Amino acid sequence: VSWGALIGGHALQGNTHVAILRFKEMQLQGMKPNKMIMLNVLKACGGSGGINIVEVQSIHDQIIRNELETEPAIGNTLLDMYAKCGSLIEALEVFHALQARDVVSWSAMMRAYNAECGLSSKVFDIFVEMEAAGIEPDAVIFSCVLKACAFARAISEGRLLHERIIRAGFDS
């Protein structure tokens, strides 16, 4: 059985500690992780319900050491992990380092800002920046921006956004 299958299986089953332990064993044997292994290890960090920021930072260090930080899927997953644990500074660093941002990147960054309730204006800013970059909002993006409208009590902006949601066909 390959290390990737072993780590991925444990991550899928929610066996966070075992997945990370196997990852560390793999490294002790001198094996270099690939993209899929790193994705599975990152997902394992969030699999048990509580995301361990120390583990995410450790995995991030491994990603950098193994020169995998330019992989879009890894960057997005790492950004999402930092966002989920409320680590805004690290999320921003990963976001700005991404060479190619897609709708997943933008929504993860919006979730990070929404986790910090006082930063709704940043969600609006990033929404405008995303559209300027030519990225079309999806249901997740609209949800993030609506949440920011609620936090900011931005009723008129919320109404305008609701109209856009209807025009985009996400109202059902």
List each language-model region with its residue ranges.
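Core domains of intracellular innate-immunity/apoptotic signalosomes
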Residues: 15, 25-30, 128-134
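Residue-level detector of the short coil/turn that links helix A to helix B
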Residues: 14, 51, 86, 117-118, ...
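Alpha-helical repeat/alpha-solenoid scaffolds of the HEAT/ARM/MIF4G superfamily
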Residues: 45-53, 66, 76
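Pentatricopeptide repeat
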Residues: 3-4, 8, 19, 30, ...
